[in-house]
Amino acid sequence: MTGNLVQRHHAKYKDDLPFWRSWTKGKDPILELGCGHGRVTIPLARAGRQIMGLDMDWDSIQFLKSELADDKKDLWKRIDIIHTDMLHFQIDRVFGSVIIPCNTYSTLTARDRQLLLGNMTQVLQMKGLFIASVPNPFWIKALHENLWENDIDSEPDLETIFTHPETSHPVQVSSRLAATADGIRWDWLYDQLFPDGRMERYLQSTEHKLCSQEIYQQEFRKAGLKTSAILGDFEGADFDEDSPYLILVGVKDM
């Protein structure tokens, strides 16, 4: 149930799609780590890319497969979906680019990032691209310090309202933030409102780890990746402390 609400909530977010289309042009086939419901996967396939998506969440994989089954343009011919762990996958194939959109990379511990990079570079061709987007590390650090030092959680902030895909009841989406020992926990609260006044809440939580641009780049270098671009948004602006995102583009050169 929660997965369907998450998919509906994020389906309208498309600001990053031109970026992924542009940077993967000529870098087929693409491997997407954490493909989820296919928010990025399907548009890339529609743009003519050959793409493989990995995800551990079975419900998300099933949703994506159902979307492909209903598609009238034979997108399934350009998309392979695998239910597996992005840290330990074994694929007998080489890719021109590997991407990890949707801020997923910042949810990994340092040990997990090491495993992912070591595994990923085994299937990335020489001069292939690895692209990861994360929330601005300066913002994560400042927010963590504020919440941690004051021992507080943020108040839920109403983000949007949409119609439940199955019941047609309104769903209020709120978010709240809390400091953990090594990061920020981001809770999404999905409140389904019933006509009789009842409310049913679903919770989706993600934790973003404290890290820095410098550490990310050091990890890239150790994995045989040269950082070729450091961007602050999906329109290509340079990264600085006020950027909404940190987007790292690495080129395999070892």
Segments from the language model and where they lie:
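Conserved class I S-adenosyl-L-methionine
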Residues: M1-D28
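Class I SAM-dependent methyltransferase "Motif I" SAM/SAH-binding loop
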Residues: G34-G36
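Class I SAM-dependent methyltransferase SAM/SAH-binding core
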Residues: A45-H88
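A short acidic, Gly/Pro-enriched loop at the edge of an enzyme's catalytic core
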Residues: L87-S97
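A short glycine-rich, Lys/Arg-flanked "PGG" loop and its adjoining helix->strand segment in the class I
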Residues: Q114-M126
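SAM-dependent methyltransferase
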Residues: A132-E214
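C-terminal lobe and adjacent flexible extensions of AdoMet/dcAdoMet transferase-like proteins
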Residues: E207-M254
